[in-house]
Amino acid sequence: MILFTALLPPQDVVAALESELARQGVDPALRWSPPSNWHVTLGYYGDVPEIPELALSGRPAPSLRIEGAGTFPGVLWLNIAGEGLAELASAAGAGADGRKYRSHLTLARYAKEDPDAGKAWAERLMAFRTEPWVAREAVLMRSDRDERGTSYRVVERYPLNG
């Protein structure tokens, strides 16, 4: 089973983002992630046979906000800023593989051969901001893929202090 830990945006943040995307219009060149899949990854564990032991419960709850956008090859994302996020991600295992942690919310995917599609949207969303919110829990998510695409489901919850 493919597992990762994440923070889920609250409904008011999801609604604000949905409204902004509706205002901007839909671009068929991008494969948009459904709002039910929006999350901020803390740690990625890959395909593992059992649930990892995680010491996340009771850690300080980070205050987060969306500010700005960017791209990875083939991925359009929103930047997640906030105090305490890097520490929580580190506790969840981010960076253990030697890669730098980049807090983000994946919005869409596009053909790597067409980087301009993602870059144009990143520019359009660069000024998008949300009010801060406090992430009161981290979740362990399972990723499932079928003919309809990828879906995520919460396996465990870790309450945070704050």
Each model region followed by its residue ranges:
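Histidine-dependent nucleotide/RNA phosphoesterase domain, centered on the 2H-phosphoesterase fold
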Residues: 1-162
